[in-house]
Amino acid sequence: MRILQRALTFEDVLMVPRKSSVLPKDVSLKSRLTKNISLNIPFISAAMDTVTEHKTAIAMARLGGIGIVHKNMDIQTQVKEITKVKKSESGVINDPIFIQAHRTLADAKVITDNYKISGVPVVDDKGLLIGILTNRDVRFETDLSKKVGDVMTKMPLVTAHVGISLDEASDLMHKHKIEKLPIVDKDNVLKGLITIKDIQKRIEYPEANKDDFGRLRVGAAIGVGQLDRAEMLVKAGVDALVLDSAHGHSANILHTLEEIKKSLVVDVIVGNVVTKEATSDLISAGADAVKVGIGPGSICTTRIVAGVGMPQVSAIDNCVGVASKFDIPVIADGGIRYSGDVAKALALGASSVMIGSLLAGTEESPGDFMIYQGRQYKSYRGMGSIGAMTKGSSDRYFQEGVASEKLVPEGIEGRVPYRGKVSDMIFQLVGGVRSSMGYQGAKNILELYQNAEFVEITSAGLKESHVHGVDITKEAPNYYG
């Protein structure tokens, strides 16, 4: 029998406090998603069909993190999810949605409803701006067969030229009391759009994670060999692809990664792995970040069904030991129950953590609401569950094309308590990490990694760490017993 190492998880260890002059409110949580993409907070929502679609992704990016849209949908639907995130807000919308004057109000309604916008610029066949259609123009219109050109606000409009700053645009919009400012070139061709909502969101969400065009960042999951899906997602503006597999150290994953890096200009996160060798091979094949974790998730049964995996603390430590030599970020995926677990993962060298169960219970997650014994819950399932595998994740567990009655699941379906908005959950997690960094005297995540010292604790130590000897009469928002 070959025993490679003693393996530990989050509940097996604690960080030792250090002399500190650092206050939690003064620490920086900036980190990296990949070697080329930054994060303002080290949190990622998981690519699971009960966790991340566009609503969760938008909420995460506004707070400074990022969401990874799951792949249990056809390519066009996933592309639409990415587009919704990308068009949800922007400093300057460089490719604005527009409509032509001969279209009907019914056509315009489809566009505004689909993209959740309140109006659209109107252009002619040459792309020249000829008007704008807003809620004010259509508010009292009942005949949706009318032409857009008969109802729109016609030129001349208040416009701005390419290159205007957001501050200048804000002053101009305030002066003329308008909510939308079309951007045109010298020939009056529509080139962009600035909305008052985007300017307000810049103030409301100062830590929002945005790309070079002022759009929210978002990632998307793909499976083995899905180069066509990857290409469509890149065209839609996705910031990073997550090549998602239960076993990231497989020949097909390595081959797919190499093909993507040859044909597309996009950062690729690859996982999941738990060993030094796997990390090294993924980096050699072109991975821009390595995702770590086999079996730590609350809904994952891989370790029991297959007898394979590694406790998460040791897995992170293994992978960081290799990835840090190449300056490749490590993402700790799974096993996060408390903010203290996040702090431990970051102290071990992870650049960010991926969260499923804690976000599955939020308002923005796509899971179904349910009532059980008078309390609100939301559905949550592993991507290795029967339900998720029949919807499209079977390739993640190397069972693509297998009949539903022949699938061997590596996950379960369940429910989690409703936890309010994504922002409420992230607020508590961020607060816990800040507190930990204060105890460690760490001004930033790199210092946390450099400073942290761990002790291994016993089962008695774990029992002492949790609430004991008292009945909880009022639940805390960051402690679940």
Feature annotation, model-predicted:
Residues R62-T77, V238-S250, D288-A306, I336-F369:
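Glycine-rich phosphate-binding active-site loops on the catalytic face of alpha/beta enzymes
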Residues M1-S21, H161, A285, G307-A332, ...:
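Alpha/beta catalytic cores of nucleotide-metabolism and tRNA/nucleoside-modifying enzymes
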Residues K55-I58, D228-A236, V274-V292, A332, ...:
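Catalytic cores of alpha/beta
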Residues K25, M73-T83, E141-S145, V189-N209, ...:
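Active-site-adjacent beta->alpha loops and helix N-cap segments on the catalytic face
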Residues L23-N40, A46-M48, T77-Y115, V122-D124, ...:
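Bateman/CBS regulatory modules and CBS-like beta-alpha motifs in cytosolic regions of diverse proteins
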Residues V69-D74, I117, P121, L128-L144, ...:
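Short beta->alpha transition motifs characteristic of CBS
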Residues V69-N72, F98-I99, G119-P121, T159-H161, ...:
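Catalytic beta/alpha-barrel core
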Residues S38-I44, G91-P96, D211-A220, E259-V274, ...:
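Short beta-strand/loop segments at the ligand-binding rim of alpha/beta enzyme cores
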